[in-house]
Amino acid sequence: MIHFRKAVEADAPRITTIYANARRFMAASGNPNQWIDGYPSEADVRVDISADVLWTACRGDEILAVFALIEGPDPTYAIIQGAWLNDRPYAVVHRLASSGKVGGIGEICLRWCLDRFDTLRVDTHADNRVMQRTLIRMGFVYTGIIFCHNGTPRLAYQLDRR
């Protein structure tokens, strides 16, 4: 059975390995540019843990997936080429990655997030077809393009269950 828990400092090396494996998977899937230069690094993981926003999906003691779940507003979402569905309070899912051991774990994580927040916003790289398919299948709506803190564009999606 899959359960969710906040990440703790002791999880940082394992989570860093999951992110490294995710970077390799993305590159092999035609998405070599979304997470570059070792991002997210172990230092990034530790920042998310310290901020109390990093979650893990686990089976027993094994971490199957990791993601940051952050209540908005997100500064990078303030300007969008397009339009959000609404201005309701929302949460953002960032840095979702799978260990690769359970198919569909990304969707399981997003559904868990939707059980906690009526409105979710997510962004992804234009080359991340896997994430785009998951978001569309779940009912997320493409809303436009946002720009990351480093200026790179991302496709923006929103799902509002209200």
PLM features: residue spans?
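Conserved beta-strand in the GNAT
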Residues: T56, E62-G72
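Conserved GNAT-fold acetyl-CoA-binding loop/helix
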Residues: R23-D44
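Conserved GNAT acetyl-CoA-binding A-motif
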Residues: R116-D127
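Conserved acetyl-CoA-binding loop-helix of GNAT-fold acetyltransferases
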Residues: K101-D115, R133-R137
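Conserved catalytic-core motifs of GNAT/GCN5-like acyltransferases
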Residues: D123, V141-L155
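Conserved acyl-donor/pantetheine-binding loop and adjacent beta-alpha core of acyl/acetyltransferases
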Residues: A68-K101
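Glycine-rich phosphate/pyrophosphate-binding loop shared by adenosine-nucleotide-utilizing enzymes
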Residues: I2, D61-V66, A91
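A short beta-loop-alpha structural element at the N-terminal edge
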Residues: H3-T17
